[in-house]
Amino acid sequence: MICGSKTKSYLKSQNLKILGQGKLNGIVEISGAKNSALVLLASSLLTNEKIILENVPFLTDIEKMGNILKNLGVNLVRKNNQLEIDPTTISIKELPYELVKGLRASFFCIGALLTKFGEAQVPLPGGCNIGSRPIEEHINGLIALGAEIIIEKGIVKAKIRGNKNRLHGTHIKLNCPSVGATETLIMAASLAKGRTTIENAAREPEVQDLCQMLNKMGAKIYDSGKETIIIDGVNKLGGCTHKVIPDRIEAGTFLIAAAATSSSITISPVIPHHLEAVTNKLQESGSKITIKGNSISIKSKEIKGVDIETAPFPGFPTDLQAPFTTLMTIANGESKITETIFENRMNHIYLLNEMGASIKLNKNVAHIKGVKTINGMNLVGSDLRSSAALIIAGIIAKGSSNFYGLEHLDRGYENFELKLKNLGVKIIREISKNTFEENGYKIESKSENLSKLGAA
């Protein structure tokens, strides 16, 4: 039987087959941060000069953003993990719905297009189905900067108010430290006239990475990484070469996978202080963490239950709540997981319970009693991070599991199963010739293996 919401239907050509109770051993090369690369791509719209981005991961979300830029007229050339971006050929300021419907980060483009060209039209965004992620903070901030905005038939239409040709600096206080709103408003303010102050700004590393790149381009942004960011608008921005920071969420996912399997691995390159909230909790749960330069090593045996509560950076990241929940299912004792960022990010718990976990869910709080083992089964991921959590569950489970929903996983993890295989996990990506329907799902059968199970 396959479990999950019966309201959804999956008909995909690939799935992962996982043999459980595996161990991890070795070194993991961490990719560039997806959430940073996406906003850096959007920020390239602010200049008329070439941008070179290094350490850009191969992900479907990156491909979607690239297609959005190409549709605007931007010329993109990829050489391995390097992207050369030439925005001098931009010809339109409107984003088509068919390109943005599955990518929430597409909305970042509105701030850049508006401040550079004086107008922009961007459909309301899509992305992971993890609850409401409203854009009111973006809209209110742009209005404060001098934009006139209307929303018609799902399209946000923005232009600079009156006869002015530039946005104007202002003071903005965000109701919550929204990463997306902070990034959108930083881009818009970078070419505005005068000083903009953003209070209660997001402090995430990805925001800091954006500010560092914009400053390389000639922006004047101060105090990124603090609760109040100051931007002095400039007349124009130039080109630059910038290396995307390592993906702290991917790094944390592998650390949690190692802890869940009582394994020892090293991850590199990373920026250790970006992961401090995660490594502190892993240490509290019984793992030994060693930091050396830009690498982190973990050695884990028995895990004990600990409580976590998600919070904006530097707190425990919401994107690692689901993987950490999987870890706690087999921990000694009890634990409590509290999700404070998104209201619909606990879907993985139902599947974990089907595998044999003991979790009671009360709204946004999961109460977990650790069990000795969970059992493999057919699994369906409903979003990016729950997919990673369920794959970790398949690795620690007794027996085999089939994971469906790779369209979610491939949005944010570069070569995930290959990296796991290199660590010793017995996992393969299968391609299917036929399908059958069970419990409301189209399930693949008669699969052809893309790689040998357990091969490095």
Swiss-Prot record:
GO terms for biological process: cell division; cell wall organization; peptidoglycan biosynthetic process; regulation of cell shape; UDP-N-acetylgalactosamine biosynthetic process. One of its GO terms (molecular function) is UDP-N-acetylglucosamine 1-carboxyvinyltransferase activity. UDP-N-acetyl-alpha-D-glucosamine binds at residues 104, 319, 341. The active site is at residue 128. Its main location: cytoplasm. CDD domains: UdpNAET. Phosphoenolpyruvate binds at residues 34-35. Keywords: Cell cycle, Cell division, Cell shape, Cell wall biogenesis/degradation, Cytoplasm, Peptidoglycan synthesis, Pyruvate, Transferase. Its EC number is 2.5.1.7. PANTHER family: UDP-N-ACETYLGLUCOSAMINE 1-CARBOXYVINYLTRANSFERASE. HAMAP family: MurA. This is UDP-N-acetylglucosamine 1-carboxyvinyltransferase. It comes from Prochlorococcus marinus (strain AS9601).
